[in-house]
A protein has these predicted regions:
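Active-site-adjacent structural elements that line small-molecule/cofactor binding pockets in enzymes
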Residues: 1-306
């Protein structure tokens, strides 16, 4: 299992674009396999990743994830290919549906037929990226374009998927899934079997599974878990997340996080690996500044051990 860094928490703490790029550069220098950034409000994740290209040399850079409702797939393809060229073909384009509350509350777009939405979105996006041409007419998304020229290789595409229909789409048509707050039991018993079956039926390689949860090496686990529970309480009310947490047998986000001693966090990482996770994207959740160094040291050792 490869170990990467999820830098998305920097956005919610008000980090500048320069600080986020610096964070990715350090992850590259320290030997982590990948660096992931969510598309929230600002900054634009793909633009930030394009800037990371000049400060990094080998690390894989990915979006985790770009919500699809606000961007036409042809426009996203153009932006992804531009970013891919800028960073030397190291991009993974992670996309996802987001949630009814954010799509309807912020974008004022009806969150209707989400699985069909993603199916049609991929029907435009994938040929645009791979074939550089698309001709598709759907009920939600359509595209007609030829001659998309770019020297960049097609980036890998992954879909945030936890339920059966989305896992089938991810397995059949993309490189895998990107997960948040999904634990080892849910991955082993629910996510990986459905994803692998769909990929095999479509004649595709075994898919990647990128899992991300809060991580902290600390002597005060109850304090950190309490903060995780408070800050991430909203996920308890989102059906897709509630479903995977129920499958995990946990009460909430704090229970699936890796928070505790070095031995406890290492055991948690091993559980993710044994469940079939191919990539673990650690979101370093630091409450006490004294926990930052031991958390990063453990993750760095795990990342470079193999």
């Amino acid at each position: 299992m490869r170990i990467g860094i999820n830098g998305s928490s920097l956005i919610s703490t008000g980090a500048s674009l320069a600080q986020i790029v610096d964070h990715a550069a350090v992850a590259d220098a320290e030997g982590f396999s990948s660096y992931w950034l969510a598309q929230l409000a600002v900054p634009d994740a793909l633009t930030a990743i394009a800037l990371m290209g000049a400060r990094t040399s080998r690390i894989e850079l990915g979006t985790a994830v770009v919500p699809t409702w606000a961007r036409h797939p042809l426009m996203l393809a153009a932006q992804a290919l531009t970013t891919q060229e800028a960073i030397g073909n190291r991009l993974v384009l992670g996309i996802g549906l987001a949630h009814k509350v954010s799509v309807e509350g912020t974008l004022k777009i009806p969150f209707a037929t989400p699985a069909k939405h993603m199916d049609e979105y991929l029907s435009v996006l994938m040929p645009a990226l791979v074939d550089r041409a698309v001709s598709f007419a759907g009920d939600i998304w359509s595209g007609e374009m030829a001659g998309l020229t770019s020297p960049a290789a097609a980036p890998g595409v992954m879909v945030a998927a936890m339920g059966p229909r989305m896992l089938r789409l991810a397995g059949e048509r993309t490189d895998g899934t990107i997960l948040w707050l999904s634990g080892p039991r849910a991955i082993a018993q629910q996510i990986k079997p459905a994803l692998d079956q769909a990929a095999a039926a479509a004649g595709r390689p075994t898919p990647r599974i990128v899992a991300s949860v809060p991580v902290c090496v600390t002597k005060k686990p109850d304090d950190v878990k309490g903060m995780v529970a408070a800050l991430l309480a909203g996920y308890n009310d989102l059906p897709s997340y509630r479903g995977v947490m129920d499958a995990e047998g946990v009460g909430g986000p704090a229970d699936v996080s890796l928070i505790g001693s070095e031995a406890e966090v290492l055991a948690g990482l091993q559980s993710f690996a044994e469940a079939g996770t191919t990539d673990f994207s650690a979101l370093e959740f630091i409450v006490d500044p004294d926990d930052a160094a031991p958390t990063r040291a453990l993750l760095r050792e795990a990342a470079t051990a193999g």
